[in-house]
Design a protein with these regions (language model features):
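Mixed-charge, low-complexity intrinsically disordered regions
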Residues: 16-18, 23-28, 44, 66, ...
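Tryptophan-rich substrate-binding surfaces of secreted polymer-degrading and adhesive proteins
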Residues: 1-36
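N-terminal module-boundary/linker segments of secreted carbohydrate-active enzymes
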Residues: 30-113, 121, 394-396
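Short, low-complexity, Pro/Ser/Thr/Gly-rich segments in the mature regions of secreted, periplasmic
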Residues: 25-28, 387-395
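A short, acidic, amphipathic alpha-helical segment used as a generic capping/interface helix at domain edges
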Residues: 298-312, 341-362
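Residues that scaffold, gate, or flank divalent-cation-dependent active/transport sites
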Residues: 373
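Chitinase-like catalytic core of GlcNAc-active glycosidases
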Residues: 81-301, 317-321, 326-343, 363-366, ...
Length: 396
């Protein structure tokens, strides 16, 4: 996924760094377009760190939002129990050294984290994925044992694909097959619960990956079984951005999400490094990092929204979370205070502490919070994970 992660030798800062993955960019800052009938965005890639790279879109129009009826949530089947915490704290663990510090063993990750996202798998070409464990994580045998120990405690440990400079081609039947088989081998070897899709490079309207990635993931789940964990962490431009302007990268993840609704465990877009956002609930852009932004975007994913003449049907509340930076060092923009995280969670689950925007109803099954990153949080003295976990424990 694009903005999310820095690679070896870089800080999760607005610094471009070569990595094992091919070209990546970061959709940061910049003026977010207002919805118009015929937008023509022109993304301008500008690498910046965060749970993924992102091209910086520069749409031409200066749209004016037109009020539209809020789609009513579509009833969805009851989720199958997964063993995942009802309200989860999800974080990315660095399989590389950067200014947050050297890689350290998974065994040293605080048990406050419910989902540990290993960052990242490598592009081995032709749709294949590989994984090389950083020496700082210990021997391969130790890494495997550490993953098993975390899972024995009820934690989920998954492999993320993408990152700030990450890309993998899944543009044909052959590449989809390689993607499935190589990841199944990795999951089996290391004991991962599943994967996280942080792939944005090459994801655009009409791109072959929109067709073949869902096929590959469905086949992977068929091999792994019903316990397969699938998360996605695209920048909001690729999802809710479709409301503003549906074309190019704007809303480009929507077809992938729609194709994988039955397989999806949780969608937690990145709400940092991308600027302010337009939603159906306000005439102007909502400030990045604010509680209103977190509530509004979660509301869009749960209650649905219009895009390109279509309607995005809401996901189950337990399939939705929000992604924020763990501190001011881990992202270039979009920092969220602990108070805003707490207010957003309480508003979404109990209709308490809401600001200007509130959901149509309380969603007590709202999944939780994703952050970039576990390593930066430890570097900063657990200033994010401890208070956020405390709030998550109080939710209904």
């Amino acid at each position: 996924l694009v903005t999310q992660t820095d690679h070896v030798g870089s800080g999760w800062n607005p610094v471009s760094t070569p990595s094992l993955w091919s070209a990546g960019g970061t959709c940061n800052g910049g003026t977010t377009p207002t919805p118009t009938p015929t937008p023509t965005p022109t993304p301008t890639p500008t690498p910046t760190p965060t749970p993924t790279p992102t091209p910086t879109p520069t749409p031409t129009p200066t749209p004016t939002p037109t009020p539209t009826p809020t789609p009513i949530p579509t009833p969805t089947p009851t989720p199958t129990p997964t063993g995942l915490a009802k309200h989860a704290l999800i974080g990315y663990w660095h399989n590389f050294t950067n200014p947050s510090g050297a890689t350290y063993p998974i065994s040293q990750v605080s048990d406050d984290w419910d989902v540990i996202v290993v960052s990242f798998g490598d592009n081995a070409g032709g749709g294949n994925v590989s994984l090389t464990i950083d020496p700082g994580a210990g021997t391969e045998a130790q890494f495997i044992a550490d993953v098993a120990a975390k899972r024995a405690k009820g934690k989920k440990v998954i492999l993320s694909l993408g990152g700030q400079n990450g890309s993998v081609s899944v543009g044909s039947t052959a590449e989809a097959t390689n993607f499935t088989n190589s990841l199944y081998a990795i999951i089996t070897k290391y004991g991962f619960d599943g994967i996280d899709l942080d792939l944005e490079n090459g994801v655009a309207q009409g791109a072959a990956i929109q067709t073949y990635l869902p096929i590959a993931v469905k086949n992977l789940k068929a091999k792994v079984g019903s316990s397969f964990y699938l998360s996605m962490a695209p920048e909001w431009v690729y999802v809710e951005g479709g409301y503003t302007s549906y074309g190019s990268i704007w809303g480009a993840y929507i077809p992938i999400i729609n194709a994988l609704r039955s397989e999806l465990t949780v969608l937690h877009p990145q709400y940092y490094n991308n600027g302010d956002i337009y939603t159906p609930y306000a005439t102007g852009a909502i400030k990045a990092g604010s509680a209103d932004q977190l509530v509004a975007t979660a509301r869009m994913l749960i209650e649905g929204f219009n895009y390109g003449g279509n309607t995005f049907a809401g996901l189950r509340p337990d399939q939705v979370g929000f992604g924020v930076p763990s501190g001011r060092s881990s992202a270039g923009s979009g920092f969220t205070t602990n108070a805003d995280v707490s207010n957003a969670l309480n508003c979404l689950t109990r209709l308490l502490n809401c600001g200007t925007i509130k959901p149509l109803q309380a969603y007590p099954d709202f999944r939780g919070v994703m952050t970039w990153s576990i390593n930066w949080d430890r570097h900063d003295g657990y200033n994010f994970s401890v208070p956020t976990k405390t709030v998550l424990k109080t939710l209904p």
